[in-house]
Amino acid sequence: MRASWVAARKGQANVSQLHFARQGVVTQEMDYVARRENLPESLVMEEVARGRMIIPANINHANLEPMAIGIASSCKVNANIGASPNASDVAEELKKLELAVKYGADTVMDLSTGGVNLDEVRTAIINASPVPIGTVPVYQALESVHGSIEKLDEDDFLHIIEKHCQQGVDYQTIHAGLLIEHLPLVKGRLTGIVSRGGGILAQWMLYHHRQNPLFTRFDDICEIFKRYDCSFSLGDSLRPGCQHDASDAAQLAELKTLGELTKRAWAHDVQVMVEGPGHVPMDQIEFNVRKQMEECNEAPFYVLGPLVTDIAPGYDHITSAIGAAMAGWYGTAMLCYVTPKEHLGLPNPEDVREGLIAYKIAAHAADIARHRPGARDRDDELSRARYNFDWNKQFELSLDPERAKQYHDETLPADIYKQAEFCSMCGPKHCPMQTKITDEDLEGLEKSLKSKGKAELPA
């Protein structure tokens, strides 16, 4: 779809959506997003120019269907997939991608760390994906030197970052906010550093006794990104990994640096969103969202969860969806899903489905709470179908139609029950929705009350 759109831009020094928006140009991607979000083109252009909305759209991702991440658009959901040295292969990752897109992922991140040819799996995912693809390049940078921190140099990072851009990656998590002076702040934590990318860079700084190369070479990364329109997802290396560590000095020190890096990227006309925690008690979620908006000048916020309790391994898609719904309500632009396997193992395709549905619920609930135009239309339509016992319509409107039909049919599988005015919960005689209160019923009731000298029904 985009091949003809981007053909004229190739070779330009800066092809980012932010660059065009600041020149007053409405790109085809902005027009597409405006129609998709039911927003005026001018508003989309203004939000992109201001940095409050990004359209991750690498010029080398030709089959991408453009989408927006920002406060003015609907709350989005990212699904993480990726192979590890211990599990998965290319076919398995493509199956996860297919399921993620089927169940509504707005973006997908390939977090492969090994076990497969990383370039092969990434290009296969990009070529098969209509949604933006994100990556964490430090994983491959370390893999390229066979896991040897001592052999990893600054140019290795930049080489991998540009390779990902050339392959069509739409946004990259760049852990540039973790500085060498932040490392002492980690000592008082219960769980230390829980970001894999952050852990790699902390090891690099401790071994080489030098500043984070992604920070010192940040302007070079900006120069790479603007040639491809790759967006920054500024990584939160010091996100809290437990309730105890939430909103601590380490997290907030890095957030301040991320705010400064946001401005530096904007100075290059490069699009930016900022990643956030993590594990956060419910009473601290609003503070975290407001603080990010303040420090990062309202750049889109992209949070992992946050998990609101740490005692439910196997159910962290639930513990985190609670926090995600709240974060979305307070203004977070995109939610990164968590699967039931979080903290336990590599997710399989069914885990992807479970995590994604939990987060689509959270994002949709946030849109309703924020009174986004049309956000509740589907809810109202399903409610009408429920009241009218239109079972097939209910299934069709569900976030997971297959699961809804499966649960209904476990006890009432025959087709005749798709017209029944009950389910197996209440049975044929006790469903309250069978009670239809009509105007005729109310007129009869009012006449009866009047004949007995009772008060009239309220209007």
Curated annotation (Swiss-Prot):
GO terms for cellular component: cytosol. Binds 1 [4Fe-4S] cluster per subunit. The cluster is coordinated with 3 cysteines and an exchangeable S-adenosyl-L-methionine. The gene is thiC. It holds the Pfam family ThiC_Rad_SAM. Catalyzes the synthesis of the hydroxymethylpyrimidine phosphate (HMP-P) moiety of thiamine from aminoimidazole ribotide (AIR) in a radical S-adenosyl-L-methionine (SAM)-dependent reaction. The keyword Iron-sulfur applies. Zn(2+) binds at residues 279, 343. Pathway: Cofactor biosynthesis; thiamine diphosphate biosynthesis. It catalyses: 5-amino-1-(5-phospho-beta-D-ribosyl)imidazole + S-adenosyl-L-methionine = 4-amino-2-methyl-5-(phosphooxymethyl)pyrimidine + CO + 5'-deoxyadenosine + formate + L-methionine + 3 H(+). HAMAP family: ThiC. This is Phosphomethylpyrimidine synthase. Substrate binds at residues 80, 109, 139, 175, 195-197, 236-239, 275, 302. GO terms for molecular function: 4 iron, 4 sulfur cluster binding; carbon-carbon lyase activity; zinc ion binding. PANTHER family: PHOSPHOMETHYLPYRIMIDINE SYNTHASE, CHLOROPLASTIC (PTHR30557:SF1), THIAMINE BIOSYNTHESIS PROTEIN THIC (PTHR30557). Belongs to the ThiC family. Its cofactor is [4Fe-4S] cluster. Its EC number is 4.1.99.17. [4Fe-4S] cluster binds at residues 423, 426, 431. Keywords: 4Fe-4S, Iron, Iron-sulfur, Lyase, Metal-binding, S-adenosyl-L-methionine, Thiamine biosynthesis, Zinc. The lineage of its organism: Bacteria, Bacillati, Cyanobacteriota, Cyanophyceae, Synechococcales. One of its GO terms (biological process) is thiamine diphosphate biosynthetic process. Signal peptide: none annotated. It comes from the Bacteria.
